[in-house]
Swiss-Prot record:
Subunit structure: Monomer.
Reaction catalyzed: tRNA(Gln) + L-glutamine + ATP = L-glutaminyl-tRNA(Gln) + AMP + diphosphate
Residues engaged in binding L-glutamine: 67, 212
Name this polypeptide is given: Glutamine--tRNA ligase
Chloroplast found in the keyword field: no
Organism name: Salmonella newport (strain SL254)
Locations listed in the record: Cytoplasm
'KMSKS' region, short sequence motif: residues: 268-272
Main subcellular localisation: cytoplasm
Record-level GO BP terms: glutaminyl-tRNA aminoacylation; glutamyl-tRNA aminoacylation
UniProt feature coiled coil, ranges: none
Family from the record: Belongs to the class-I aminoacyl-tRNA synthetase family.
Length: 555
């Protein structure tokens, strides 16, 4: 496949191809401009892959710029987290990290230019009055009584704002556009507001801060961005983006293009709702493995490659739609099926004793680390006469469809022997505590000599060598596909989104490291937890099951 064939195609790339072919641009320069007021989620990953991916494919540049214009909500913690997420996804920004606050002096100068042109004014309406005067989608707004102040008065008042002469909420700078515009964003939008708050980059130098719509377009222009890519909710804002650049003295005028945001089933993307989940302790934090945050997905065991593949598959369009969670899960399942080494762990253990196995003895059984990749090598796993198997792998009675261990019948232990269930012991409540079996000593990794067929295979862990492990069975956070549509989204949290089990793993799992996934044979894909696991306590998170159990539930 050629490089051109390997590239994804979408309407944005078609625009870029046309711009390069026509000579409108000779290079491509994009940017990813998050506000550092929270953790990035899977929706941001789509934008990261789009902006950085385009820059890579066209040998261009992509800036990482923090839109840090609201010191009240922003924190250096989020700056560091976002940088880490972008790098973990496999991307590198061009040059130094940028901050919108780098341009505060220039932004202030452009605001003064608009005042001098009679295109901006200081308004002393309260925020509530501004909302009231703005009108509605069906009714035009009305002019502020402060709209027709002279240039000189506006310059003096804006300087008074800058030097702390007004209290918060008592004055703001607004663009003078059209209060009757059919687009509410064009009804004299606020350009600057007062906030007496220390900024993580500029300290206490400023007490006036520019709004997003004023900052964003100018920052793009100052950085020479050729294609400013935003999600569809900013479509109307493009009019203001162009108005600002058309009315200031700036040599570059980037163009904004909008694409659909990522909506994913069984979760929420709203920063407000995600924050509520954290602050009300419905989850453990922003990196909870049930969260759609990049840090949560990483802790759960998702790989950067699987997230990039997911973003590639869903594509870039102007059509809003909701992606099935199964699509994301399919990407990580395919990745780990191909790349994760195998190991054995028993999640719901019951003791099995092989009565005719030499008492007190054990042996090593050779197992491949991957059934289809001999280059991944093999490992030695201890076997003994007492093992743990999963409780679901034994029944006293069963029909022909049940291919595991049944009383009086045989099954193969993975890469070991054929065993036959002879009897069980139970506790006072009737629960099986021990299964007693016999084994065929001539069947180590081979069929019985007499030709009898043994169809079932189950996994196991030697009891004498087993590592106690905590297993966190994570599932979808919500029980309905569209929790955001519920009257109370918290009421549809899945009560089974986290089930904690205590089981046993094979000794090789002692070497597990956070971020390195395993396939626990016949169970699913798991990784060591980065928060709770210690040298003395192994905690594994289920990344995803071997198959989509939700599809079955919906049938």
């Amino acid at each position: 496949m050629s490089e051109a064939e390997a590239r994804p195609t979408n309407f944005i790339r078609q625009i870029i191809d046309e711009d390069l072919a026509s000579g409108k641009h000779t290079t491509v320069h994009t940017r990813f401009p998050p506000e550092p007021n929270g953790y990035l989620h899977i929706g941001h990953a789509k934008s990261i892959c789009l902006n950085f991916g385009i820059a890579q494919d066209y040998q261009g540049q992509c800036n990482l710029r923090f839109d840090d214009t609201n010191p009240v909500k922003e924190d250096i913690e989020y700056v560091d987290s976002i940088k880490n997420d972008v790098e973990w996804l496999g991307f590198h920004w061009s040059g130094d990290i940028r901050y919108s606050s780098d341009y505060f002096d220039q932004l202030h100068a452009y605001a003064v230019e608009l005042i001098n042109k009679g295109l901006a004014y200081v308004d002393e309406l309260t925020p509530e009055q501004i909302r009231e005067y703005r009108g509605t989608l069906t009714a035009p707004g009305k002019n502020s009584p402060f709209r027709d102040r002279s240039v000189e008065e506006n310059l003096a008042l804006f300087e008074k704002m800058r030097t702390g002469g007004f209290e918060e909420g008592k004055a703001c700078l607004r663009a003078k556009i059209d209060m009757a515009s059919p687009f509410i964003v064009m009804r004299d939008p606020v350009l600057y507001r007062i906030k007496f708050a220390e900024h993580h980059q500029t300290g206490n130098k400023w007490c006036i801060y520019p709004m997003y719509d004023f900052t964003h377009c100018i920052s793009d222009a100052l950085e020479g961005i050729t294609h400013s890519l935003c999600t569809l909710e900013f479509q109307d804002n493009r009019r203001l983006y162009d108005w600002v650049l058309d009315n200031i003295t700036i040599p570059v005028h980037p163009r904004q293009y909008e694409f659909s945001r990522l909506n994913l089933e069984y979760t929420v993307m709203s920063k407000r709702k995600l924050n509520l989940l954290v602050t009300d302790k419905h989850v453990e934090g922003w990196d909870d493995p049930r969260m759609p945050t990049i840090s949560g997905l990483r802790r759960r065991g998702y790989t950067a490659a699987s997230i990039r593949e997911f973003c590639k598959r869903i594509g870039v369009t102007k059509q809003d739609n909701t992606i099935e969670m199964a699509s994301l899960e399919s990407c990580i399942r395919e990745d780990l099926n191909e790349n994760a080494p195998r190991a054995m762990a028993v999640i719901d253990p019951v003791k099995l004793v092989i009565e005719n196995y030499p008492q007190g003895e054990s042996e090593m059984v050779t197992m491949p680390n991957h059934p289809n990749k001999p280059e991944m090598g093999s490992r030695e796993v201890p076997f003994s006469g007492e093992i743990w198997i999963d409780r679901a792998d034994f029944r006293e009675e069963a029909n022909k469809q049940y291919k595991r261990l049944v009383m009086g019948k045989e099954v193969r232990l993975r890469n070991a022997y054929v065993i036959k269930a002879e009897r069980v012991e139970k506790d006072a409540e009737g629960n099986i505590t021990t299964i007693f079996c016999t084994y065929d000593a001539d069947t180590l990794s081979k069929d019985p000599a007499d030709g009898r067929k043994v169809k079932g295979v189950i996994h196991w862990v030697s009891a004498a060598h087993a590592l106690p492990i905590e297993i966190r069975l994570y599932d979808r956070l919500f029980s309905v596909p569209n929790p955001g549509a519920a009257e109370d989204f918290l009421s549809v949290i899945n009560p089974e989104s986290l089930v904690i089990k205590r089981g046993y793993g094979e000794p090789s799992l002692k070497a597990a490291v956070a971020g390195k996934a395993f396939q626990f044979e016949r169970e699913g894909y798991f990784c060591l937890d980065s928060r709770y696991a210690t040298a003395d306590k192994l905690v594994f998170n289920r990344t995803v099951g071997l198959r989509d159990t939700w599809a079955k539930a919906g049938e």
